[in-house]
Amino acid sequence: MELLSLSQAVAQQLDRLDFSALYPGYHRFPFALYNEERVCLEGQLFPWDDRFLGNTSIEYEGQRIAIWSVALDPLPPVSLAASMAHEMFHCFQFDQGEHRFPDDLRLLNAPAEQDFYQLKLAENCALAIACRTGDAAEFRRFAALRNERAAHFPQIAAEEWKAETIEGMAETVCLRALRVLDPAQYAEALACYLAKLENELPLLFDARRLCYYTGTVLCLTLERLGLPFYNDFTGTTLYEQNRPTDALCFEAPEVPALAALFAEHLKEQQTTLAAHRQARPFHPCEAAICGYDPMNMFRLDQWLYCSHFLFIRQDGAAQQLHGPVLAQLAPGSDYRIIGYYCCLLYTSPSPRDRG
């Protein structure tokens, strides 16, 4: 569908939504669809420029707008309208003084310990069951397992809960919009999310992506159980504001398949890093990371692998390193590098951070 026609079709679907019913006080924001050549912002067409990157919320000429790349993520109008409700909620979060953003690079630094993932899988399964069945005991079991994991791995848990707060809340709004626009598609999407938590073991190793699903299912479980929902934008994370206070102690069952998958996952990462180091030259470089694609990167020890791109800042100038790029982090740092393996780079006046 042509860009203007698609934008009009999405706008018609958005007209069907009562935004304040999706979330108290929430309202519609301007949106733009774009491809490699053109942008359509609220029915107005103009040439694309590099302010339009990814699917996110940006500040554009003094106002917050939601943007979506129809070239990278083509969707039919109903699905795209629901997705725009997600991105518009990011605009709303900024307006409400949201501050609970995760540290993406710290979120990558998950412990290379099987127990961490064993607990994570058990808590995800309990959450999925609670959402599907409305069983309050399973919700308390989920909270107990999560609290246990957080006690052993507090730093990574804190970043996960922040990511859940930002992305899970926005994705909840997306699914609530879909529930209005196409109830059958909503039911299918929710079933898919629950299946991901219970069965998609590789997703355990993609912390940021997983938080989209855990945060959404957490919100929908509270809704299913008829529990009060708290989300003070200037307060603690979504989970901390809504976790049950009577959670008991539970043990995570062993899952043999997870042990094998965990070993395979580590081996694949090690192989990727070794092949990259062998195939590309090393460039010594003391610089700060200033932009990245959080959905397409991983970290192993002091190595940060970015399949798409990485922006660094050195002596006040920003550079884009074209992916794949492998950066060597400075000892004890999540944001400073001492060099990288990469073929190409170019100077850019405006590095792009995550959205």
PLM feature segments, named:
Residues 46-77:
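Active-site scaffold of zinc-dependent metalloenzymes
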Residues 60-65, 137-152, 187-196:
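Active-site-adjacent bridging/hinge elements
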Residues 1-42:
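N-terminal mature-domain "stem" immediately C-terminal to a signal peptide or N-terminal signal-anchor/transmembrane
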Residues 155-317:
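Pan-zinc metallopeptidase signature
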Residues 346-355:
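Conserved small/polar residues in nucleotide/adenosyl-binding loops
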Residues 27-34, 303-319, 343-345:
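Short, hydrophobic/proline-enriched secondary-structure or compact coil segments at domain edges
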Residues 95-140, 160-185:
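Post-HExxH zinc-binding segment in Zn-dependent metallohydrolases
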Residues 82-94:
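Active-site recognition of the HExxH zinc-binding catalytic motif
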